[in-house]
Amino acid sequence: MSRNDKEPFFVKFLKSSDNSKCFFKALESIKEFQSEEYLQIITEEEALKIKENDRSLYICDPFSGVVFDHLKKLGCRIVGPQVVIFCMHHQRCVPRAEHPVYNMVMSDVTISCTSLEKEKREEVHKYVQMMGGRVYRDLNVSVTHLIAGEVGSKKYLVAANLKKPILLPSWIKTLWEKSQEKKITRYTDINMEDFKCPIFLGCIICVTGLCGLDRKEVQQLTVKHGGQYMGQLKMNECTHLIVQEPKGQKYECAKRWNVHCVTTQWFFDSIEKGFCQDESIYKTEPRPEAKTMPNSSTPTSQINTIDSRTLSDVSNISNINASCVSESICNSLNSKLEPTLENLENLDVSAFQAPEDLLDGCRIYLCGFSGRKLDKLRRLINSGGGVRFNQLNEDVTHVIVGDYDDELKQFWNKSAHRPHVVGAKWLLECFSKGYMLSEEPYIHANYQPVEIPVSHKPESKAALLKKKNSSFSKKDFAPSEKHEQADEDLLSQYENGSSTVVEAKTSEARPFNDSTHAEPLNDSTHISLQEENQSSVSHCVPDVSTITEEGLFSQKSFLVLGFSNENESNIANIIKENAGKIMSLLSRTVADYAVVPLLGCEVEATVGEVVTNTWLVTCIDYQTLFDPKSNPLFTPVPVMTGMTPLEDCVISFSQCAGAEKESLTFLANLLGASVQEYFVRKSNAKKGMFASTHLILKERGGSKYEAAKKWNLPAVTIAWLLETARTGKRADESHFLIENSTKEERSLETEITNGINLNSDTAEHPGTRLQTHRKTVVTPLDMNRFQSKAFRAVVSQHARQVAASPAVGQPLQKEPSLHLDTPSKFLSKDKLFKPSFDVKDALAALETPGRPSQQKRKPSTPLSEVIVKNLQLALANSSRNAVALSASPQLKEAQSEKEEAPKPLHKVVVCVSKKLSKKQSELNGIAASLGADYRWSFDETVTHFIYQGRPNDTNREYKSVKERGVHIVSEHWLLDCAQECKHLPESLYPHTYNPKMSLDISAVQDGRLCNSRLLSAVSSTKDDEPDPLILEENDVDNMATNNKESAPSNGSGKNDSKGVLTQTLEMRENFQKQLQEIMSATSIVKPQGQRTSLSRSGCNSASSTPDSTRSARSGRSRVLEALRQSRQTVPDVNTEPSQNEQIIWDDPTAREERARLASNLQWPSCPTQYSELQVDIQNLEDSPFQKPLHDSEIAKQAVCDPGNIRVTEAPKHPISEELETPIKDSHLIPTPQAPSIAFPLANPPVAPHPREKIITIEETHEELKKQYIFQLSSLNPQERIDYCHLIEKLGGLVIEKQCFDPTCTHIVVGHPLRNEKYLASVAAGKWVLHRSYLEACRTAGHFVQEEDYEWGSSSILDVLTGINVQQRRLALAAMRWRKKIQQRQESGIVEGAFSGWKVILHVDQSREAGFKRLLQSGGAKVLPGHSVPLFKEATHLFSDLNKLKPDDSGVNIAEAAAQNVYCLRTEYIADYLMQESPPHVENYCLPEAISFIQNNKELGTGLSQKRKAPTEKNKIKRPRVH
């Protein structure tokens, strides 16, 4: 209670009729210590009149009722009478909890939970808090007890190793119940052992390779210790497989299903130690075979342990042989490096009395150990305070090598990072001595850290003390100096007088540990250096003594205010660790910063800046001193207290991380909002997710933002949350939408995340000067983001060096250093190498001499433009771009530097799955070259996850990514994007994509883009085109190409019109050549006047409406599509336009196919105004080289009439400018017509075919009025999202159910499967469609006719060659039953495949619902139960005896068969649907019913009277009887 508070503190006892004796006892005991003037006894009526929290202490008994709920809702401080008695008795303060406290049974207990469902966890938290305990969500040192639902989590393992009690949730429930009954006063009154978490709780254990006795023992012990034993290995059920030897079918399946494969040692160690052990220590993997191949292709001597280094080790080229010592030294060294580890397994770790911080600062990776050895070493590292890494990366400082080192060799070859590679003996010696030993005597011979040569290596302080005794003294290497000098002389021939020392790069790679770093600069190996250059190099290297003493907050003083004592001391320690100074309130010195909580507090002292703990943590995270004004969270946030305007809001954050995200989450919770990590459309109670209402982000982009747009949810800036906090009212979202925010606002918000140094004063903060120095050593290309091309970076770098003034916080350099591309750059694993071109002198020579004031201007003469253009051309020719640039760019006027056009995958962030780790570097490089960003591990910024796997993959990584809703694509998506140099649709590349089963994507993409974008192109080019009503073929081509090129460049295509024209002409020429090739391959005599190239003159007889233009383009694209589908040759993208002659490989097979295609193409001979060209694609089926097509290709094929080409007459009175088209009986929607200029036409004209049927506009409109209600099946998540959005956009509905819904009209199926949803759709006669139907609808812009896209139609089955026999049967069944049932419906009979059936089901309860839905969807009546009276009514009885549980009550099958009921196995239902003629019932009869069937046959009474209904209707219903 602060002194400034005017309001007195009252203790109020709530009197009611239900008060217990304990209530009055508490009142008496408090009177002894508290003055009665501050004690009040209030009635329930008075309590209900309280309208706000008056900061009094309320004593309630019981903890229920209207009054209790009222006070709790107001946030009043409520305790039970037992709390008062306990506190009086133990002289303790009443807890200041934000929640009611009933008693103090758990007053000294702090719990954390693991592996509990959300509801259970919240219940545990509630009871613990009501019993005076504390709850932490994270496991930390303060936690005293862990409540576990099952074993195996990280919390569980840590708590078990720390010997913290791990108990069941029932312990909390029992404590609460006993305390309610007043039977206990402390948690220790109950025996905790009764509630201890069993060792194998939640484990389902299976074994392989064990003998019978061992297997039985494992089974008994598993059940005894709370686990479950399973004889069969079942996917998604078994959690552990105990393996004798790593081989066998169970072992292989377990590995694929991500089941823990462990040794028996894991099982018995867990029982011995009393808790479930970490499975990773006991992994069973086949021992890798020792490789006998040499590490280098260069012949070496027999003893090559030290010489077997690869080129990636060499960063100082002049000292390659510096560490090649004599063989005698090698032998003596090797004898030291091979420690004897036989006794390591039996080592007693507890025997060491080493300090807890012995390995402080060591980041250690263990390589080549397994079993007990690995366990012992891990325990040693943990006890010594070291950080143990599970993955070898550049953060590791020490690698301890054991029996094999294959993984280390790969890392050593790929990475320039050189950790200390030592044997286990070094670790054991450190622990036995009790202090850190020098690594040098223990370094492994094959892994010498040679990026700093041995003779020049900066030594640690420990090494300096022992320098005299070290075998690596300088005189040992005197003979090698001559070789070094020779290398230096040789290298100097290529340096052209360069004064750059290679050690400049080395100084960046490894931090200096001592002031002796300057010594190598005066060494004899650098005699060729000039004197003044030595001084410039030494200027680059800062003094070590200054580095060690300075920190981020050097010379800065701080006041810490408004925090609890614990938090205040933690913050003070952090500031001191970063060289800051903590001031006391009594000090007269003005502090630079006052650190306060996010919501602020009263600061009476005079300070320079008032900042929040968010600012402090962010500065430390980025090691940069930020300007407090750069982010609103860096200064106290004004909040209207007591207001919760966001109570009904569920908020998700995007593009926020670290302290910033934590602060925003705290602020949102304070305002009453719920914050969740996932952005979801619908609530999911099982996963504890609520439907999101708001997305807060910094800039447009990312999967969450796209989802928000799709779902019409507000995506707002952080300012919306701050404004809501300031006013206490929910701010209007429309004023804070991310779309409306300016670029400056967004960039300001993203500065923290991108780590921009906003206020780094170098004079005051030499620590930041060190960072600046390090940046000057590397090349100025943006090596991390990979967003700019190398050649542009060179030119822009030169302009910045000459024209731009130094940025704030960066020191002026006396002389900029050159940036040599050393091997350590271009062999770096994590970076894409881009060569740096030194064109400074060349550009300087081109500058026009002028006055001194003009010298700093950027050269902008036409010659410099030529250089840039030719560099662009060189890069374009060396990479596989989709469209080659012109070989002769025209000289333009000097232009100011423009912003670079975004690359195809701009704003895409990819992450490659661990499953494809071998290809990760390669794929990351490709992504970077396309303008994408990449992440080594998955985080919330990732938009595309690259994965390859099965349709229902159980991989944990895949599952977790799938829940995030990002694009999951195949690696071939990225490869094809690079091939096409464009952003291809992700839906065409699911993670199951197999290129061997598909045709070229580029054909699909081009055709689809042309069709979908043409209309907008026509309508938007009125100013550009002289006459938009008369379009020639080439105009259409140009427009489509222009659209494709301008789409990614955001409208910058106008400036590149010449380049686009050149590209268009080139594309047209390539197409002409390919068309000529096709036509020349055939021996067909050409009609008179027919040409082999596209007509440039065109034809003016095209329709004068935009719609007809679109129709024209659509017809033409279908012809081109047919050509694309028939040829697989792709023109060389590197061919320049000037190269008229191409050297190609003559493929005779391809020539034959082109001839076959040409023979199938029947060109019309009359340029009729409304002629439509259609290609016969059915003959393509005969090709032995046919491959399955993609969905959009199938869609375009199916739109074409598979019949011969027809030429129809133009209608005299077109209605609404739509054409009446002759079609087949299948009622196709009229296909748009192509103009006559699509291909050259010959004379004389061909006579028109007779019309079969005309569809009028009225019929079409009637057809469109029908309902479109879809269900989706066997599609991946990306396709589901895409198609749901498409269907809703076209006016249809989507039912998102796992099971079949009879109200649906269409079901789109990825693959025909024998599952409930598919079979039920077949039985109900629904449209069962291929996904290409939706692609066709997307292209047409409305729902099209279904026949050609139906599973079972020839247009689908003929192009899908990869489906098996069962899938084909299922597909044909769908079409057959749909036609049957539709015919019956047309005749007025509404029924399904099973109409007339009255079924008794005798199946397992878990499967009964599925069978029931299936039968009912086909019109069957399912009778309740299987009692004898029902046999009179029933026609069929289906039973699945094999899968019934033993305790299921039986059914009298013999009695049913006697009453002429078909008693069949359940397989009959699916086969009845799939087979063309109904299957014979005898093949499916249950054993008990076979004799009755045979008797009926002999007597000739195949059917009972109940099956022989006299009506015609029953004859139709029962066509299957034999």
From Swiss-Prot:
Tissue: Highly expressed in heart, brain, placenta, lung and kidney.
Post-translational modification: Phosphorylated on serine and threonine residues in response to X-ray irradiation. Ubiquitinated and degraded by the proteasome. X-ray irradiation reduces ubiquitination. Deubiquitinated by USP13; leading to TOPBP1 stabilizion and activation of the ATR-TOPBP1 axis pathway.
Keyword annotations of the record: Chromosome, Cytoplasm, Cytoskeleton, DNA damage, DNA repair, DNA-binding, Nucleus, Phosphoprotein, Repeat, Ubl conjugation
Renumbered ranges of motif Nuclear localization signal: 852-858, 1517-1520
Any one biological process term the GO annotation gives: mitotic G2 DNA damage checkpoint signaling
PROSITE patterns: BRCT
Swiss-Prot/TrEMBL induction comment: Up-regulated during the S phase of the cell cycle. Up-regulated by E2F1 and interferon.
GO (cellular component) term, any one: BRCA1-B complex
Annotated GO MF terms: chromatin-protein adaptor activity; DNA binding; identical protein binding; phosphorylation-dependent protein binding; protein serine/threonine kinase activator activity
Ranges for domain BRCT: 101-189, 195-284, 354-444, 548-633, 641-738, 900-991, 1259-1351, 1389-1486
SUPFAM superfamilies for the chain: BRCT domain, Uteroglobin-like
CDD domains: BRCT_TopBP1_rpt1, BRCT_TopBP1_rpt2_like, BRCT_TopBP1_rpt3, BRCT_TopBP1_rpt4, BRCT_TopBP1_rpt5, BRCT_TopBP1_rpt6, BRCT_TopBP1_rpt7, BRCT_TopBP1_rpt8
Subcellular location: Nucleus; Chromosome; Cytoplasm, Cytoskeleton, Microtubule organizing center, Centrosome; Cytoplasm, Cytoskeleton, Spindle pole
Result, substituting residue 1273 to A: Decreased interaction with autophosphorylated ATR
Region described as Interaction with CIP2A: spans on this chain: 756-891
Residue numbers carrying Phosphoserine: 301, 860, 864, 886, 888, 1002, 1504
Pfam short name (any one): BRCT
Region Disordered, residue ranges: 1018-1058, 1083-1118, 1501-1522
Comp. bias (Polar residues): 1039-1058, 1083-1114
Alphabetized InterPro entries for the sequence: BRCT_dom, BRCT_dom_sf, BRCT_TopBP1_rpt8, Secretoglobin_sf, TopBP1-like_BRCT0, TopBP1_BRCT_1
PTM annotation (Phosphothreonine): residues: 298, 779, 848, 861, 1062, 1064
Similarity field: Belongs to the TOPBP1 family.
Cited function: Scaffold protein that acts as a key protein-protein adapter in DNA replication and DNA repair. Composed of multiple BRCT domains, which specifically recognize and bind phosphorylated proteins, bringing proteins together into functional combinations. Required for DNA replication initiation but not for the formation of pre-replicative complexes or the elongation stages. Necessary for the loading of replication factors onto chromatin, including GMNC, CDC45, DNA polymerases and components of the GINS complex.
UniProt free text on domains: Some BRCT domains specifically recognize and bind phosphoserine/phosphothreonine marks on proteins. BRCT domains 1 and 2 bind phosphorylated MDC1 and RAD9A. BRCT domain 2 binds phosphorylated HTATSF1 and TP53BP1. BRCT domains 7 and 8 bind phosphorylated ATR, POLQ and RAD51.
Protein name as it appears in the record: DNA topoisomerase 2-binding protein 1
Lineage, broadest ranks: Eukaryota, Metazoa, Chordata, Craniata, Vertebrata
